[in-house]
């Protein structure tokens, strides 16, 4: 029974994340390996309110900075040659990947 690899990807840049996901999908289609996904997970949103005035006197005006973290999961049959090709996929600096054999 072939094992599966669960690939978790996350990034703050959605375009780069989708680029890597499409590379993995085309790799799986070329090799004819079974793939399920990409499954989009809920986007984490972190908001940090910061007071504009450095000294704290006068009117209190706030700036709100936010960062969104987008996540995807892909399950792929872990054939040895597919895993080797998967390691060669070019990944931008702001996309993070975890590979887990299940």
Swiss-Prot record:
**Which PROSITE patterns does the UniProt record give?**
RIBOSOMAL_S10
Q: Which SUPFAM superfamilies match?
A: Ribosomal protein S10
Instruction: Report keywords, A-Z.
Output: Ribonucleoprotein, Ribosomal protein
**Phosphoprotein as UniProt keyword:** no
Query: Keyword DNA-binding on this protein?
Result: no
Q: Name one GO biological process term.
A: translation
The GO molecular function terms of this record are: structural constituent of ribosome; tRNA binding
InterPro entries the record matches: Ribosomal_uS10, Ribosomal_uS10_CS, Ribosomal_uS10_dom, Ribosomal_uS10_dom_sf, Ribosomal_uS10_euk/arc
Pull one GO CC term from this UniProt entry.
Answer: small ribosomal subunit
Describe its function: Involved in the binding of tRNA to the ribosomes.
Name the family the entry cites.
Answer: Belongs to the universal ribosomal protein uS10 family.
Q: How does it assemble?
A: Part of the 30S ribosomal subunit.
Q: Which PANTHER family match?
A: 30S RIBOSOMAL PROTEIN S10 FAMILY MEMBER (PTHR11700)
Report the protein name in the record.
Small ribosomal subunit protein uS10
Q: Which organism is it from?
A: Sulfurisphaera tokodaii (strain DSM 16993 / JCM 10545 / NBRC 100140 / 7)
* Name of the coding gene: rps10
